[in-house]
Structures are given as C-alpha cells and as structure tokens.
Amino acid sequence: MSMQTAPIKKITLNHLQAKKNQEKIIAITAYDALFAQIFDPLVDVILVGDSLNMSFFNQNDTLSASVKMMLYHTKAVCAGAKTPFIITDMPFGSYKDEKTALKNAIRVYKETQASAIKLEGGKEKAKLVKTLTNEGVIVVGHIGLMPQFVRLDGGYKIKGKNEEQQKKLLEDALSLEEAGAGLLVLEGITTPIAQTITQKIKIPTIGIGSGKDCDGQILVWSDMLGFFDSFKPKFVREYLKGKELVQNAIKQYADDVKKGNFPNELESYH
C-alpha cells in the first residue's frame, strides 16, 4: 500500500527552499481576488507586484505606486489565494531608510496575510535586509534590471553583459543571501551570470527574463495571457490571446443585446 502525501495547505518559505535543485518554482503576479483564486491551485508563488501601476493603472513605470495601493491589492489577493506563498512589493520610497522600511514592512504584515515583502537593490540593501529579518519579516531580494531604478538607468536595460556587471551581480546575490534574504528575484540579466548565481547561492532564484537556469520563473499575468499587444518584452511567452478572446465575447454580448436575443425567457423572471 503506497503512502499518499497530504496536500499542502499553505506553501511556506521552507517548502520553496526545499525545491532548490529539485523542482522548479512556479510564480505569477496577481492584483485581485478573482485572478488570485484562479491561480491558487496552479502556482507556488503569487507576487503582488508594483507592476500593477503599469498593467492595472496604465502608468509608464512603477514609481508612483504607493504603500496604500499595495496594501489594498495585497488584501484582495490574500482573500482569493489561500495556498500560494504571497509576496508583496515594497514600492518606491517605502524603504528609503531603516525606520521607514520597518514601519511599512510591519504594516504589511499586520494588515495583510502576505508571506513576504520584496525590495529592490543589491549589497547596499544587505544591512536593511538583516534588520527586517531580525524583526521576523521574510525578505525577497531583487537584483538585475530593477524597475524602480528605471529613470536613473535611463530605461529598461539588461544587466550582466560585461565582467564588471557580472561581478557586481554575484556580489549582490551573495550579500543578500548572507543578510537573510529567503528568495532572490533575478530580472533582466544574461543567462550565464544567472546560472552562476543560481549555482553559487543556497537560496532559490526566481527569474524573469534571466534564462531557464533559475530555480523558478515568474511572469506578469496580463503579459503571459495576451492582454497587451502594444509592447511585448522578448522574454514573454504568450499562452493565450486574452484580449482577443475577451473582445470577441463582448462583441457577441453587444450583438445579442442589440438584436433582442439577451435576455431570453430562461434568463428572465415572471
């Protein structure tokens, strides 16, 4: 008689770290309860990303996202998804110093059911990561292409193309791991250095536009499901023509209304 493993009720950091070199971590973004509930049984990690400022609020970058905004959407995601490990982005300016970072990270933990917070930056953030973890906050690091630095960088630029950048990325990864980061997001870095970092550090790496050798992958759900056709990053694979499917359904609905075919007798009360 074979023993069946009981389904995991809630994915924890320990579960994710146990996947290192064993099984790929599946991650996706979500910003509301509806989609979080749909994604719940299919993914390990849901990121409530400040990317919502672009994909949800139609802004040019993530910089105007606020703590209030992130709390609102994190609460919604936590209401819809019960099993995945839920990470909340710390928005631009919310961790500019230790006092501010502690205040906002603790607020996230008190007001939502988020599993962890994510912040951008390399070894210069190591002391802050250590301070947060000492207070019981799980921190996810984020290095490489960092959207909160897009104006400083002059655009969305791939990192790791030269030896100097590769050395810095590895130093950043090792420093964040030593400081206590539980996971590390690698965004927009060349495949060889992403592979090196993944091999050198003991915590899992989750890649976005950083090659297949990371311990897991994440995509913005609206990119992956084909809801934006104005611009598609090279690293995005569309698994659905979502915009086209929804528009066709709305056209059919509008046509039925105009022709008097909706509602019909079965859809009406008497």
From Swiss-Prot:
Pathway: Cofactor biosynthesis; (R)-pantothenate biosynthesis; (R)-pantoate from 3-methyl-2-oxobutanoate: step 1/2
GO annotation, biological process: pantothenate biosynthetic process
Gene Ontology CC terms, in alphabetical order: cytoplasm
Top-level taxon: Bacteria
Cofactor: Mg(2+)
Family annotation (Pfam families): Pantoate_transf
SUPFAM superfamilies, per database record: Phosphoenolpyruvate/pyruvate domain
Coiled-coil ranges (or none): none
Cofactor note (record): Binds 1 Mg(2+) ion per subunit.
Signal peptide per UniProt: none
Subcellular location: Cytoplasm
Residues annotated as binding Mg(2+): 50, 89, 120
Active site, UniProt feature: 187
Binding positions for 3-methyl-2-oxobutanoate per the UniProt entry: 50-51, 89, 118
Catalytic reaction list: 3-methyl-2-oxobutanoate + (6R)-5,10-methylene-5,6,7,8-tetrahydrofolate + H2O = 2-dehydropantoate + (6S)-5,6,7,8-tetrahydrofolate
Molecular function as annotated in GO: 3-methyl-2-oxobutanoate hydroxymethyltransferase activity; magnesium ion binding
InterPro entries in the record: Pantoate_hydroxy_MeTrfase, Pyrv/PenolPyrv_kinase-like_dom, Pyrv_kinase-like_dom_sf
EC number: 2.1.2.11
Keyword Transferase included in the entry's annotation: yes
The entry's keywords: Cytoplasm, Magnesium, Metal-binding, Pantothenate biosynthesis, Transferase
Gene3D superfamilies: Phosphoenolpyruvate-binding domains
Main function: Catalyzes the reversible reaction in which hydroxymethyl group from 5,10-methylenetetrahydrofolate is transferred onto alpha-ketoisovalerate to form ketopantoate.
Entry's family note: Belongs to the PanB family.
PANTHER family: 3-METHYL-2-OXOBUTANOATE HYDROXYMETHYLTRANSFERASE
Assembly and oligomerization: Homodecamer; pentamer of dimers.
Name the UniProt record assigns to this protein: 3-methyl-2-oxobutanoate hydroxymethyltransferase
Species this chain originates from: Helicobacter pylori (strain HPAG1)
Lineage of the species this protein comes from: Bacteria, Pseudomonadati, Campylobacterota, Epsilonproteobacteria, Campylobacterales
Gene: panB
